[in-house]
């Protein structure tokens, strides 16, 4: 049985940990509201961009000289996987889910005979994958902001990806990130960003922009090819930006939930330790009283 001194020390230690987890929960909660609003506000823009590019792609299908960002390189032998994780832990299964999804995707592609390269945005992704895939990891970026995500960050990362694509270092690029649903729910998402994947609604001829009436006829100025040449690189940056916003909101939600659970568990542990401490102290006092009474009777 632990001594009273040991129990007091453990109670003090758990209380100290509880203060830390409670503070981290409040910090994550304050960041979550803004991160959630930003991620949700970006969704309509990115979705509209996808539909517009899908319509442009459909109207230029079969034309010669299509951009490789749209039509691809003509092969899919080399795949670049961009994994979005956090720089820090203490956020439940947030990082682990991305690491597992990336690991699964790498194995699937390698089983098909593809060459896989990994670019990790966030320290935890690189740390979790480098042991199993040291040769596949070609870079890691761990300097993204822990307070807010700016478009300049996404633009910098997208330029790196585009430079690699133009240099012929890969054929297909897939983004793996957590899409935010709620503070307790995040969905691991795989999104192909190079070459551009036409949305299923556009590919099926069902543009959701208009639910009734005649199908819209678009006229473009300048030409479709010029618009695509300008928008396709921007779309890569926008999709990376959306992934980063969704990932950041998911991280804050996961951390708030994890720290809330940790705070509750610490409270339960303090109650149990306090009960054990009081029982031990009571038993010790009772034992001392018995010894005193026994000594008095002997006299």
From Swiss-Prot:
Positions in coiled-coil regions: none
NCBIfam families: ATPsyn_F1gamma, PRK05621.1-4
Function field: Produces ATP from ADP in the presence of a proton gradient across the membrane. The gamma chain is believed to be important in regulating ATPase activity and the flow of protons through the CF(0) complex.
Key word Oxidoreductase present: no
InterPro entries cross-referenced by the UniProt entry: ATP_synth_F1_ATPase_gsu (IPR035968), ATP_synth_F1_gsu (IPR000131), ATP_synth_F1_gsu_CS (IPR023632)
UniProt keyword list: ATP synthesis, Cell inner membrane, Cell membrane, CF(1), Hydrogen ion transport, Ion transport, Membrane, Transport
GO terms assigned for molecular function: ATP binding; proton-transporting ATP synthase activity, rotational mechanism
Gene Ontology terms: biological process: proton motive force-driven plasma membrane ATP synthesis
Gene designation per UniProt: atpG
Predominant cellular place of this UniProt entry's protein: membrane
Protein known as: ATP synthase gamma chain
GO CC annotation terms, alphabetical: plasma membrane; proton-transporting ATP synthase complex
Entry membrane topology: Peripheral membrane protein
HAMAP family: ATP_synth_gamma_bact
Subcellular location: Cell inner membrane
Superkingdom of this protein's organism: Bacteria
Family from the record: Belongs to the ATPase gamma chain family.
Signal peptide: none
A Pfam family matched in the record: ATP-synt
Keyword Ion transport attributed: yes
CDD domains: F1-ATPase_gamma (cd12151)
Residues that span the membrane, as ranges: none
Gene3D superfamilies, per the entry: 3.40.1380.10, ATP synthase, gamma subunit, helix hairpin domain
Subunit note: F-type ATPases have 2 components, CF(1) - the catalytic core - and CF(0) - the membrane proton channel. CF(1) has five subunits: alpha(3), beta(3), gamma(1), delta(1), epsilon(1). CF(0) has three main subunits: a, b and c.
Species of the source: Rhodospirillum rubrum (strain ATCC 11170 / ATH 1.1.1 / DSM 467 / LMG 4362 / NCIMB 8255 / S1)
């Amino acid at each position: 049985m632990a001594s009273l001194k040991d129990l007091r020390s453990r109670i003090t230690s758990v209380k100290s940990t509880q203060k830390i987890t409670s503070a981290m929960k409040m910090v994550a909660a304050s960041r979550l509201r803004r991160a959630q609003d930003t991620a949700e506000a970006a969704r309509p823009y990115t979705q509209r961009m996808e539909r517009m590019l899908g319509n442009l792609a459909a109207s230029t299908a079969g034309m010669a000289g299509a951009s490789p960002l749209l039509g691809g390189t003509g092969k899919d032998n080399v795949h670049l996987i961009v994994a979005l994780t956090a720089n820090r832990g203490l956020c439940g299964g947030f990082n682990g889910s991305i690491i597992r999804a990336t690991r699964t995707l790498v194995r699937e592609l390698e089983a098909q005979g593809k060459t896989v390269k990994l670019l990790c945005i966030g320290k935890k992704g690189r740390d979790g994958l480098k042991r199993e895939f040291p040769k596949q990891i070609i870079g890691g970026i761990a300097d993204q902001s822990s307070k807010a995500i700016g478009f300049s960050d996404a633009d910098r990362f997208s330029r790196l990806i585009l430079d690699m694509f133009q240099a012929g270092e890969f054929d297909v690029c897939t983004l793996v990130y957590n899409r935010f649903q709620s503070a307790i729910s995040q969905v691991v998402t795989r999104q192909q960003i190079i070459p551009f994947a036409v949305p299923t609604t556009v590919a099926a001829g069902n543009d959701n922009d208009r639910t009734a009436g005649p199908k819209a006829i678009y006229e473009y100025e300048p030409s479709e090819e010029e618009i695509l040449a300008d928008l396709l690189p921007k779309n890569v940056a926008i999709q990376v930006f959306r992934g980063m916003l969704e990932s950041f909101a998911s991280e804050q939600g996961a951390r708030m939930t994890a720290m809330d659970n940790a705070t509750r568990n610490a409270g339960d542990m303090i109650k149990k330790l306090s009960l054990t401490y009081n029982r031990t102290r009571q038993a010790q006092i009772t034992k001392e009283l018995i010894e005193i009474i026994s000594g008095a009777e002997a006299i």
